[in-house]
Amino acid sequence: MDKRGGMDHVLVWRQGRFSRQINLTTVGRVSLALLLVLAVMVASLGVGKLMLSPWEVLRALWSSQPEGAALIVQQLRLPRVVLAALVGGALAVSGLILQAMIRNPLASPDILGITSGASAAAVFYLSFLAATLGAHYLPLAAMIGAATAALAVYWLAWQAGVSPQRLVLTGVGVSALLMAATTFMLVFSPLTTTLSAYVWLTGSVYGASWRETRELGGWLLLIAPWLVLLARQVRVQQLDDGLAQGIGVRVQWLRVALLLLSVALAGAAIAWGGAMAFVGLIAPHIAKRLVAPGFAGQAAMAFLSGAGLVMVADLCGRTLFLPLDLPAGIFVSALGAPFFLYLLIKQRH
């Protein structure tokens, strides 16, 4: 092992012919972000109609008797907070992959039609199938919609390969078409269905249970090995296609693999948390500003940033307008829309 100086402290680990660099500055900042996210989680568990101090929250978490404060924390608040963190983290990493793959800082699941596809499928399910099959299959319908939309965008953008620019333009067009279809279905749906759909379309973790949290957590654990496997390839996508092909990279196959990985992350997050816009745009930019280039460190920071963002948004929705419980997506959009305009202005200059 040896250390290298510079702006960032880097630890180089060597074993035989293999070596690996560990950016100590990145590790430190990710660790600090993790502590901040845990602090937000404790605060979220303590705030509500029944106010609890941090020490009372910790006692409730460790209590083996699910009654009183322990029942509220363990069965009502904790599943919701954990689901919010998983949804935000998955959307953030999905956005990070897309921004690297398309080489566009404005890329996100919203731009490529992933969110619109999930939304259209979810509204279709609520309007025509939920009465027969029940609401349990809504996440599956949303994931199928997200995957179908993404594959349609890729197929329509194909022209002897897919360029990042064509992918974005096609994604915007498909998103607009799917949003129109979603609105059309909402107009002709019963009022109760429309109200349920609007809450889902805004993005909310209201009424989250341990079943939903386990389902999303299990799905993300299945995706994690593929994320690790493709981590080193993400930076290759940031190169010019000709240069990447020159060093032996199968650019189009890699682009398909990364797109499917991004869809798997975003589709699952949207399926269980609703169409929460802008998380996949904001969190990757926070990560890029805080840690050095390198997908592993940026992915960890993006996950924590997205988790914290959605948890804070959900906390605001639960507490700022009591007794109303507003969808977290409202507060994420309130922050994300100005940030998107800022990026547009920055890109122009």
UniProtKB/Swiss-Prot annotation:
GO terms for MF: transmembrane transporter activity
GO CC annotation: plasma membrane
Family: Belongs to the binding-protein-dependent transport system permease family. FecCD subfamily.
SUPFAM superfamilies, A to Z: ABC transporter involved in vitamin B12 uptake, BtuC
CDD domains the UniProt entry points to: TM_ABC_iron-siderophores_like
Summary of the function given for this chain in its UniProt record: Part of the binding-protein-dependent transport system CbrABCD for uptake of the siderophore achromobactin. Probably responsible for the translocation of the substrate across the membrane.
Transmembrane spans: 32-52, 82-102, 111-131, 138-158, 168-188, 190-210, 216-236, 263-283, 290-310, 325-345
Main location: membrane
Keyword tags: Cell inner membrane, Cell membrane, Ion transport, Iron, Iron transport, Membrane, Transmembrane, Transmembrane helix, Transport
Organism: Dickeya dadantii (strain 3937)
Name of the featured protein: Achromobactin transport system permease protein CbrC
